[in-house]
Amino acid sequence: MGGILSSLNTSYTGLQAHQSMVDVTGNNISNASDEFYSRQRVIAKPQAAYMYGTKNVNMGVDVEAIERVHDEFVFARYTKANYENTYYDTEFSHLKEASAYFPDIDEASLFTDLQDYFNSWKELSKNAKDSAQKQALAQKTEALTHNIKDTRERLTTLQHKASEELKSVIKEVNSLGSQIAEINKRIKEVENNKSLKHANELRDKRDELEFHLRELLGGNVFKSSIKTHSLTDKDSADFDESYNLNIGHGFNIIDGSIFHPLVVKESENKGGLNQIYFQSDDFKLTNITDKLNQGKVGALLNVYNDGSNGTLKGKLQDYIDLLDSFARGLIESTNAIYAQSASHHIEGEPVEFNSDEAFKDTNYNIKNGSFDLIAYNTDGKEIARKTIAITPITTMNDIIQAINANTDDNQDNNTENDFDDYFTASFNNETKKFVIQPKNASQGLFVSMKDNGTNFMGALKLNPFFQGDDASNISLNKEYKKEPTAIRPWLAPINGNFDVANMMQQLQYDSVDFYNDKFDIKPMKISEFYQFLTGKINTDAEKSGRILDTKKSMLETIKKEQLSISQVSVDEEMVNLIKFQSGYAANAKVITAIDRMIDTLLGIK
């Protein structure tokens, strides 16, 4: 019903609406420094009109909703740009540290240690009897092996640091995820789509948690019923009815108000590095380590994972494997040469196979071919030679039988002056050692081996110069640590013979087999393989750094776009404040005028 009191109510709604606008503006200004606070706007519309006589009369203004200015599509791009930047920032920081362990070859490095090692053999070849040169060789060898082991230990330490960092990151992920699920529950309780009642502060808080969660983990967020709100802002797109955060291409860790935590467990490998499991409703664990390749978690896994449980290897594990291959190639090639130096007996390191296993079925790089066994008398004269063949089905039993067989190796129709008459071979399945020893030690005979492409001596570490299997345990034979003068630079026990020393210095120019798996052998020179290793590490770090620079630029660009939409502009809010204050004052003047009109009416007598 129309009338002067209705007019009073009309202006009163104007006062209330502008009061709300001033309140919202003040709230915007108060939160201007909060990056994740979305500026809010009051959506006002005329109240429903009614018929007054023959006229259609409006009765003031109604505050329909208070909505935040938020573009879900831009925010999604901003979040993605952020977790991509975080991925490469995390990766680069670790790869940069790893590359520092492998400086340029012209600086103090493993490469210079390697050169010093070969130069020591060269100096020894000039004077094979010089005890000082043997001591110098032992010192250079120990320096080389120490730096190889130290470099590997640094890589494994970096690997374990990244693994421990992952554990703390997953704890944070679980905390953020549970908070988001709780907020989803509260939003469901507070909001009403029909009445346009929005929990703006809860949504801002959820956006902030989601931003940081995806920074750590990546993934995709699925929201339904996203709508644009051009009345609020032309760039605004918000409101959803459901919320799911999916990671690993199929695992929902957040499903509305339900959160599925991630579990960290150590792998069964000796390194005990952490892997990630998804826990479903029935508490069943699924290994999703391989499926996480985004955010900080993805970067850490890509850096340190050791490949256990069928997962992919990380870059640090690749570097460790390459360093192990480098050490293994150096060990086997050196020992293959050193085993040719004549001694009173031959003894190998323990192996990991039984005497009835074919060499081809083991992981020992023993090839088809042959090797010669040579017996020398005390004057260094060759007195017997026997050739042993290795085929695809050869076992250690076959080798022992062939060596001990009573054959006429010298082909002089005398079966009592051949190799088997001076030396005997054995292999114990308990100690797993291959041994060749003299039948009569008092004769003082010498024995040596000459390889014809089998790598038998290098693979089994017969009379080794180097002990160990890879970069973790490579070392100078403990006998030569105690007594460097026992190093044998000769091939045959003859004064002035330094053939082994010559072959050792020549080794740096020869092709060597480098491998972790004997079915994937990389034949290279020792220096070439080291340069390949360092080149890969430095190239990976440089590539990651270049991508990081690109991702940073993209993040800054998208961040500016995001902030231009949602961030509070204090200048703009001050303009709005003046406008809303003027509107409030105008409505107040109308009320004052109506109040006087009422006084006039009441004063009529």
Sequence positions of predicted segments:
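Structural signature of extracellular appendage/secretion-system components
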Residues: 1-605
